[in-house]
A protein has these predicted regions:
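Single conserved hydrophobic/aromatic residue that forms the stacking wall/gate
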Residues: 1-7, 11-12
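C-terminal helix-coil-helix/basic helical segment that borders enzyme active sites and/or dimer interfaces
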Residues: 27-60, 73-80
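Generic recognition of well-ordered alpha-helical segments
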Residues: 32, 39, 71, 95, ...
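Hydrophobic (often cysteine-bearing) scaffold residues that line and stabilize catalytic clefts
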Residues: 57, 65, 108
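Charge-rich, acidic-biased intrinsically disordered regions
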Residues: 14-15, 19, 51-59, 80-96
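Glycine-rich phosphate/cofactor-binding loops in nucleotide/flavin-utilizing enzymes
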Residues: 76-120
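Amphipathic alpha-helical coiled-coil segments
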Residues: 64-71
Length: 120
């Protein structure tokens, strides 16, 4: 994570607990998203139907990525919105990914139908 200067000190180090929590939350969410994705891939490799697993991974990973980008922009302040860093472009691209291959709401319908079908 790039560090931002606040006065004469780095933003993430030492007593900047709120920033540290944002970094920790981002890492935890990214790892969870990665695990959902790996589970879908693993089940697919075993020949299982992965429609629900893939929907869960897609919804969670894209929403986590959006939150992580938002936090990163918050941490970096005004620099997060400049063209000098790729964050603003990544944010736009991630927003598009949330609607590609079905928006998150459609993916949630796929998940809910499966859960409520009584087949699990």
């Amino acid at each position: 994570i790039p560090l931002r200067l606040v006065g004469s000190e780095m933003c993430i180090r030492d007593s900047k607990q709120a920033i540290q929590w944002m970094v920790a939350d981002s890492e935890m969410e990214l790892r969870a998203a990665r695990l959902l994705t790996y589970q879908a891939a693993w089940n697919g490799d075993r020949g299982q139907d992965i429609k629900v697993d893939a929907s869960m991974a897609k919804v969670y990973a894209t929403e986590v990525a959006t939150r992580v980008l938002d936090r990163s922009m918050q941490i970096l302040g005004g620099m997060g919105m400049t063209h000098e860093l790729p964050l603003e472009r990544w944010y736009r691209e991630m927003r598009i990914r949330r609607v590609g291959e079905g928006p998150s709401e459609v993916q949630r319908m796929v998940i809910a139908r499966d859960l409520l079908s009584g087949k699990r």
